[in-house]
Amino acid sequence: MSQLPFIVGAPGKVIIFGEHAAVYGKPAIAAALSLRCYLLVSPSSDSNTIRLQFPDIKLDHSWNIKDLPWEEIKPYLTYDSANKPQIPSELVPEIVDKLSSFLNGFDNKMHYYACFCFLYLLMNLCDSKVSGMNFIVRSTLPIGAGLGSSASTSVCLSSALALMGGWINKPSLHENDKLDTADIPDLEFIDKWSLIGEKCFHGNPSGIDNAVATFGGAVMFQRTSTPEQPSIRTNMRNFPAIKLLLTNTKVPKSTADLVAGVGRLNAEFNSISTSILTAIEHLSQEAYKVMMNPMFGREETNVLRKLVNINHGLLVALGVSHPALETVKIIGDKHRIGATKLTGAGGGGCAITLVNDDVEESVIHNAIKEFEDSGYESFETSLGGKGVGILFHEDLDDATKFSESQFCNYVDRAAIEDSLGMANVKEWKFW
């Protein structure tokens, strides 16, 4: 077990190619965002209490360790031949029932699901001998914007609890180290348990968000034609960071309604919509080849920008854009800052811009000002980069970064990233 305190950080995600086509068994590609969720784990002054704080959603709840239903849940925990917690494919109904009863009384759904995820993972990865601890989550990701904030949180919790339970080793790689592309047991363990955490939030998630948050880089995924067959997933851990502008239109959307709309188009104009979906498939496959190039550089980035523009046009043809998203694209194109497309389901939500290599910062700021004047929120971030990592207090001279009061009181996302982000703190470790 690592000495407390420590901080875990995991990225969010955006889908860069293949939205909507993925529903029809076509490949899609998601990539990590440099915006992250951060989890501070520190010892509690009360050895009998575990406390979970999530200031960004105004959650602050404590439990007496002895009051948690350890004995009721124990019969339903299983272990593999190495005596490690066995990872179920689904939530265990009996554990769900016990925790649901235990958490009865939460009126705020977001608070309920966060506590449910936390306790489900805690009681599977630790035991009743656990000491009192404080867990504080901060997010530089917009919450509820389809950018994987719940998966990032789940990955942070799974990593911390697995490390404290002694189920994984401490990471040792630094930011600029080349990552192993082979299967890494510790990351596989984190990924699978974080999917269980995601199921606590969402019921039946695809597993893509937590995979990107765990492994970083980018992931190509493809659903199979039958539920019995596992989806195809290819991790691109060493996909390099590319400058990105993320713009949240703040327009609410219904993913289910947008998917249903494409379904109706497909039923009415099958040959046309099939051609569009096939074009998106070919586009995603081309993007994958470009992204896997070991000599990836400016030329390959330019190709991705061209594919971004094509993909947006195809999504417009499917009817899933929105005037706000088109406004983002028009403003971006007017300032010539890069290639812009909607990301995710569309119908509102977010757009991404792959920023041109030679664009001046003042031009980007002018575009951002115009986005803000339209009521949107923009984030200068990057695409790709590292997955889950840990910052250990013994590696850092500045103890204030592990101060609970400072961690809770960062005033905004910029303050969090300035203090903890990998751009400024080089002591982060990765698997």
UniProtKB/Swiss-Prot annotation:
Its EC number is 2.7.1.36. One of its GO terms (biological process) is isopentenyl diphosphate biosynthetic process, mevalonate pathway. Induction: Expression is up-regulated in response to terbinafine. Keywords: ATP-binding, Cytoplasm, Kinase, Lipid biosynthesis, Lipid metabolism, Magnesium, Metal-binding, Nucleotide-binding, Steroid biosynthesis, Steroid metabolism, Sterol biosynthesis, Sterol metabolism, Transferase. Pathway: Isoprenoid biosynthesis; isopentenyl diphosphate biosynthesis via mevalonate pathway; isopentenyl diphosphate from (R)-mevalonate: step 1/3. GO terms for cellular component: cytosol. GO terms for molecular function: ATP binding; metal ion binding; mevalonate kinase activity. ATP binds at K13, S139, G144, A145, G146, L147, G148, S149, S150. It is an enzyme of class 2 (transferase). The active site is at D209. Homodimer. Mevalonate kinase; part of the second module of ergosterol biosynthesis pathway that includes the middle steps of the pathway. ERG12 converts mevalonate into 5-phosphomevalonate. The second module is carried out in the vacuole and involves the formation of farnesyl diphosphate, which is also an important intermediate in the biosynthesis of ubiquinone, dolichol, heme and prenylated proteins. Activity by the mevalonate kinase ERG12 first converts mevalonate into 5-phosphomevalonate. 5-phosphomevalonate is then further converted to 5-diphosphomevalonate by the phosphomevalonate kinase ERG8. This is Mevalonate kinase. The lineage of its organism: Eukaryota, Fungi, Dikarya, Ascomycota, Saccharomycotina.
